[in-house]
């Protein structure tokens, strides 16, 4: 769709090579079948906007995964969704294939902030999307929220967080805005057109958010994560416990046998390598 001004992850706004990319993903799953641990408790479908994929695309990926892991026995299957992509047809399909948790990229409940970030959705779409998801039977919903934005935006965190709490998501991930080289915000900062928020102010914002969430029965269980009791993310916990995980796709990371590996962060090169049966990492690091 379009790039958020803060995004430093690998992404593509073009869908021209989507079909080839799906085939390459499936091929990587097949090539790395022997690497998958015997017991897996979670599956996370992320990478930005997987909700853009159609039913046929996702079904193809799940069919390949079912040949490798026991999907029906997974405790947690999460898919990232943007608010503007949520509709009843898509939600019913997610349930059909076994998805039991949604991670929704809300980021803010203030339309002016969303526009400044170059997000496509607005507050109304957040409210409609999350309410529809819950009415459809998705009660395990995680919301991504960004704080630490420049002072000129004059955000009302009390209002924003209160509106999110009113939706009763089971989980929140609160991330500080980071301004990275190579992003639009990074370009503005380099040219002295954007001043990052002072650390002391950011710390106060996070402390306030943390206390507010704790007062509403959310447990602060990791650096950026809050959840209702028994709703902590299995997938997140695996990272913190340094359990093995496998990342599939361009730019994906894996951690196996005390080794970290990075897939190449270029769609065309990833497709080329996967389709000629090569699954070597761009980078390998021994821990």
Predicted regions and their residues:
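Cationic, low-complexity basic patches in intrinsically disordered or flexible, solvent-exposed regions
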Residues: 286
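C-terminal scaffold of the Radical SAM
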Residues: 11-33, 39-275, 279, 283
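Local cysteine-cluster metal-coordination motifs and their immediate loop/turn environment
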Residues: 1-9
């Amino acid at each position: 769709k379009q790039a958020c001004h803060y995004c430093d992850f690998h992404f593509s706004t073009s869908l021209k090579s989507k079909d080839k990319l799906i085939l390459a993903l499936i091929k990587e799953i097949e090539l790395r079948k022997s690497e998958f641990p015997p017991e897996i408790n979670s599956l996370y479908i992320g990478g930005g906007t997987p909700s853009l994929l159609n039913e046929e695309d996702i079904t193809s990926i799940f069919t390949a995964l079912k040949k490798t892991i026991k999907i029906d026995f997974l405790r947690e299957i999460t898919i990232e969704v943007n608010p503007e992509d949520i509709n009843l047809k898509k939600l019913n399909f997610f349930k059909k294939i076994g998805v039991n948790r949604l991670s929704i990229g809300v980021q803010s409940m203030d339309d002016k902030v969303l526009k400044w970030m170059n997000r496509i959705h607005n507050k109304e779409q957040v409210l409609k999307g999350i309410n529809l998801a819950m009415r459809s039977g998705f009660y395990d919903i995680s919301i991504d929220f960004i704080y630490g934005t420049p002072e000129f935006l004059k955000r009302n965190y009390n209002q924003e967080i209160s509106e999110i709490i009113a939706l009763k998501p089971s989980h929140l991930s609160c991330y500080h805005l980071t301004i990275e080289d190579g992003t639009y915000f990074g370009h503005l900062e380099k040219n002295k057109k954007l001043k990052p928020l002072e650390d002391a102010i950011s710390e106060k914002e996070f402390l306030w958010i943390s206390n507010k969430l704790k007062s509403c029965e959310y447990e602060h269980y990791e650096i950026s994560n809050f959840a209702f009791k028994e709703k902590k993310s299995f997938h997140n916990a695996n990272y913190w416990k340094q359990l093995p995980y496998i990342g599939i796709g361009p730019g994906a990371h894996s951690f196996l046998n005390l080794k970290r590996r990075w897939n190449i962060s270029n769609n065309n090169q990833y497709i080329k390598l996967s389709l000629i049966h090569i699954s070597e990492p761009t980078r390998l690091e021994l821990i």
